[in-house]
Amino acid sequence: MPHVDLNPLKQRMQAARAAAVAQFRQHPRPDMLLTELRRIVDQALRELVKLCPLPAGATLAAVGSYGRGELYPHSDVDLLILLPQPPSAADARAVEALVAALWDLGLEPGHSVRTLEDCEREARGDITVETALLESRWLAGSRTLMKRLDSAMQARLDAAVFFQAKRVEMQQRHAHYQDTPYALEPNCKESPGGLRDLQVILWMARAAGFGHSWREVAQAGLLTSSEARDLRRAEQAFKRLRIELHLLTGRREDRVLFDLQPGLAAVYGIASTATRRASELLMQRYYWAARLVTQLNVILVQNIEERLFPRPDSDARLIDDDFRNLRERLDIVREDGFERNPTLLLRAFLVMQQHPELIGMSARTLRAIWHSRHRIDAQFRRNPVNRKLFLQILQQPRGIVHELRRMTMLNILPRYLPVFRRIVGQMQHDLFHVYTVDQHTLAVVRNLRRFTMPEHAQEYPLASQLIAGLDRHWLLYVAALFHDIAKGRGGDHSELGAREVRRFAQDHGLDPTDAELVEFLVRHHLLMSAVAQKRDLSDPQVVRDFAAQVGDERRLAALYLLTVADIRGTSPRVWNAWKGKLLEDLFRLTLAALGGAHADAHTVLTERKDEAARLTRLAGLRDDAREAFWNQLDIAYFLRHDASEIAWHTRHLYYQVAPDEPVVRVRPTEHGEGLQVMVYTRDAPDLFVTTCGYFDAKSLSVQDARVHTTRHGWALDSFIVLAPEGFADLRAQATLVEHELAERLRDPHAARHAHAPRRLPHSHARRSRVFPVMPQAELSPDERSQSWRLSVTATDRPGLLYALARVFAEHGVDLIMAKIMTLGERVEDVFIVSGSALERPRSQMQFERAILDALAGDEPRQQAA
């Protein structure tokens, strides 16, 4: 084929597309742009076919969304080259030339070359192909062949089979996206509640003969006019969002990625407020639209199913005067039942809980609830019957989480608790929450509920034991619903939430003792986590102070349960067994303190030494064998380590009190997720730096560090480190660390230059780059000793602890203890430090400035020798 100059055509097409986008920028009407882009490409393709002819008798057809008449700025152009018979060599050359020309034109075609028989065969085996062909549209070539394809596709279309296949396909797609419209970075096309769900509904309706548009589907009785209007509005919102994503990135991008969210918010003219980022406000709009689509999707799919697979109403069995069981779904007896008696809006969910044979609600009931939700007003909320019903829902032995989720989806819970409405769809770009506030709240309720189930008792034995012994444990669900209810308002959300739950308790007639408990839990829901992870639990005063704040055993048990459920509901990455151990240790120490256990330092020291001695005897060590080692240890050492650690150290060091070489011993932690590392060597200024550098290079995350210097000048340092995710063989890792870390300590200078910090996973790096944590450092003297407490907050990154350790060394600051708290990509660490530099205002200021630089990633790099 002779060379064809496509540049004039390409330039005309590009100019026309640019003009269409410019018009969209003036008047952002999604359908107008999609139609215009489709028209431009249609015209270009028809001109192209004149320059690069189709094989004789062939057809060029648009399929998929392009066939439907929609073309996004950077979408593939889906084409079918339909041949009347298998291609000859000449036909193949013609097709090849046409496809090459499509690429030269800059269209990025998604093309297939098939005969009519190929199309029928492919459609039989693949519902996606069948759907794409059902939306085919003639562009050029033989109209007769196109009509034959249309006739063949319509002839083989079985509405019932098509419905079942599309429903399964949708369920699989939803599962791929974790069955939630509330993803951090949703795909506006494919995620639940997105554009694809809207398309599936229309495909199902079209196949069943109920129309091609929302208006026609409403006319067929599957939708009300207001529902059709809501869906049309949501569809336009998602179409515009997808267009904006393409224009913002200059590529086919359907994911609302972290780094795109601020730019999108700017395009929409959304500005940050004093308490909310613009990106959070943008995403709240997205989640509200996706929730609407998800809910109406359920109603419509059920409606279509009931039309396609009708069953007589005689199958229904009355539950009571208001509800019946219709094909294992809760059905309202009278369609106007909720309007006549709004109390049924809550009782419907209670009936669902009390009848385990019900698998859901009928489409009629869902629609009636949806359209009656406005009946939940101030008068409804004041009604004692409704208040009692709401508490009954929380007190049921089953179905609590399912029904609270259903109440949220149907907008009943946000209407009943207006303060809850504010947090629906509210994302927190704080680097550790991966759910919206409302979804996190329901996840906390779910976690509390799991503690009550015998089949999950092995997951958290202490939690299961405590909740079984807690009277009226449903009060925990109340506390969970309110613990983050004031997020995004500004101010202390714990204090504001406590006021809200106090009002709820008064309105709902809670016993004063119970009301005081839930208020305490909401006000102090962060307390136990902070003490366990940031304070020295070996200090009796820390335990006494915490016990004084908690007050009694009921509060302690309830706070422990809420804390575990809260952390577990934040993100799968935030919880680990080490945090679980810290919380359990704090619980048991506080329980003993509340029970009158005398926890002064002298008693703790004596008991700990006695228990450590007993453990060393069990290991075959004589009492006199350990004395040389113990004589080098001061009181601080025995107070900072438990008996098991002291015995472990003693067994390995009693015979080498002053070794010539570094001693490194490692064992798996008792909770089985990490390693306990002991380092014993002659003290040196860069020892902590070298050790942290090694851990960082090996992707070992330090959770706890205790640094001690013996009377004769040897460093005895203890670390808890977590192995990389997915690392199964901890014993092999322990052996490797023992060998490699000892080698590093023998030659720390060479080790420091060999250090190469690990990298964060790409998605975590993107998120922390877009939503960074403002670095903070607070240095304050410790009231009970000559040490200082350094609290830091920053975005997590590889090498952060190593960078801080270098600052300590450079300023002559000695580390005594480190408590590392990592919350997703946010760190909140506490260091107990000492050093003469901290006693002088000028050098103290220089130290704090260097710490802030290190937190921000601006620390000076060390040059290789």
Curated annotation (Swiss-Prot):
The keyword Nucleotidyltransferase applies. It catalyses: [protein-PII]-L-tyrosine + UTP = [protein-PII]-uridylyl-L-tyrosine + diphosphate; [protein-PII]-uridylyl-L-tyrosine + H2O = [protein-PII]-L-tyrosine + UMP + H(+). Residues 1-318 are annotated as: Uridylyltransferase. Residues 319-675 are annotated as: Uridylyl-removing. Residues 751-767 have a biased composition (Basic residues). Transmembrane segments: none annotated. Residues 747-767 are annotated as: Disordered. GO terms for molecular function: [protein-PII] uridylyltransferase activity; phosphoric diester hydrolase activity. Residues 437-559 form the HD domain. SMART domains: HDc. Its EC number is 2.7.7.59, 3.1.4.-. Uridylyltransferase (UTase) activity is inhibited by glutamine, while glutamine activates uridylyl-removing (UR) activity. It comes from the Bacteria. The keyword DNA damage does not apply. GO terms for biological process: regulation of nitrogen utilization. Keywords: Hydrolase, Magnesium, Multifunctional enzyme, Nucleotidyltransferase, Repeat, Transferase. Its cofactor is Mg(2+). It holds the Pfam family ACT. Has four distinct domains: an N-terminal nucleotidyltransferase (NT) domain responsible for UTase activity, a central HD domain that encodes UR activity, and two C-terminal ACT domains that seem to have a role in glutamine sensing. Modifies, by uridylylation and deuridylylation, the PII regulatory proteins (GlnB and homologs), in response to the nitrogen status of the cell that GlnD senses through the glutamine level. Under low glutamine levels, catalyzes the conversion of the PII proteins and UTP to PII-UMP and PPi, while under higher glutamine levels, GlnD hydrolyzes PII-UMP to PII and UMP (deuridylylation). Thus, controls uridylylation state and activity of the PII proteins, and plays an important role in the regulation of nitrogen assimilation and metabolism. Belongs to the GlnD family. This is Bifunctional uridylyltransferase/uridylyl-removing enzyme.
